[in-house]
Amino acid sequence: MGSQPKRAAQEGAFETALSLLHRRGRIDALGTGGPELDGLIGGLEPGLFYLFYGSEDGGLPDELLLRLLVEAAARGRAVYLVCGNYRRSRTVLDSERLLSLIDGAGLDPDDALSRIHVVCAFSERHLIRAPDLVEEVLGRVDGVALVAVQQLAKLFHGRLALRREDPSEFTGVVSRLRELCFERGVVLAASCRPSGRGRPAPEPEGGSFLRHAANVIVYLRASRRGGTVSAYLVKHPDSARSGRMVSFSEEGWAWGG
């Protein structure tokens, strides 16, 4: 995959607005598989950090990560970091759903799965070490288009968090993952839960640093009556996009059937 952000940094400390516009116009963004969501965020640009959050019970953010894994496997490779203490929070890799999406995309299951490299973090200490494992994969294989992190904030935040490590370690994990992906021109996409309530969207779990670190933040919510999914764009580098919302049917959301 290309590494546009890294090359731009190497060419000089400054870049004109015109050259930036031309460069972004050539970027091969990763699609979500859903036209409404792609239209809202403009696809996922290499080197940027995307945070998708919503109710974990509804499963929308984690479902989206699975879709992104399939999109990445169709063009190259992906790293999937699964976070959560299984005994306390039942965080799992939904392999059946992933296979369903792969089949729906018309990909060969064995080939697609061989392109997805899984890293698991079952404790805060595991998560602190996870960036080293991700870096190892990025250095060992070519063509990684995506690093997806399921429930990034779960081990350090929330009522079931054990809190055995300094909270500042979480900041280090996010910074390291962001830096690794930016330098290599790889999309970083993470899911997390909302923290409390708020309108038009609650804050994402993970504290103020996570909100500032993410380049794009999207809140996903299913309608109370069912049948519809709403995506609210909380943050985007293009400020004109921020605050927009799209809705689409759950049938359209369930890529791959």
Tell where the protein language model's regions lie, with residue ranges.
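P-loop NTPase motor core
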Residues: 132-212
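Helical mechanochemical/support elements of P-loop NTPase systems and associated helical scaffolds
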Residues: 33, 61, 94, 123-127, ...
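Phosphate-binding/switch region of NTP-binding enzymes
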Residues: 178-257
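Short, surface-exposed amphipathic charged segments that create phosphate/polyanion-binding patches used
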Residues: 9, 127-137, 231-237
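Conserved inter-motif catalytic segment of the P-loop NTP-binding fold
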Residues: 80-161
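Short, well-ordered alpha-helix to beta-strand connector turns
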Residues: 47, 76, 113-116, 213-215
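The Walker A/P-loop phosphate-binding site
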Residues: 2-108
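Hydrophobic/aromatic beta-strand patches that form the interior of the parallel beta-sheet core
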Residues: 50-52, 80-82, 117-119, 189, ...
